Amino acid sequence: MEKTALYPGSFDPVTKGHIDIIRRSVALFDRVIIGIFKNSSKNRAWFSDEEKCQMIQEILEKENIKAEIKVFNGLLVDFIKEEKVDILVRGLRALSDYEYELQFTLTNKTLAKSDFETIFLSASREYLYLSSSLVKEIAQNQGDLKMFVPKNVEERMIEKVKQMRI
């Protein structure tokens, strides 16, 4: 029986840590959907949903990762039902992530009328500290992004910082 996994997030921007979780999910499940939460407050997001999809698609193609990208809004549990998701994939970096993710999981289980499981994948050691917020902070201060984000994301972030300074 085919297992469909969903890895949801804002991916603003997508980091090497996100890509690592996606790659590992593809190795575990038959079908993997990367679910991008539709921006409800575009003024805070660095990238539009379309830009996020494009950046992720470029990475998937370059690295030959077989996953789908879908943008959704509304409740995650509704998207899970719509896509017939069996497994919700969440990445964990630290104990504080676990506490948040456990609340998130229990809330989704309470709201859901369908059966799905949540799988937590530990961040790889080199990405334990990595977050999109940290990457944006580094970019705003003109730091080196190479070890945190793929090249295409780095280029777009540098361009965004230039636009912000105009």
Q: Can you say where each PLM-predicted feature lies in the sequence?
A:
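Nucleotidyltransferase catalytic core that binds NTPs
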Residues: M1-I166
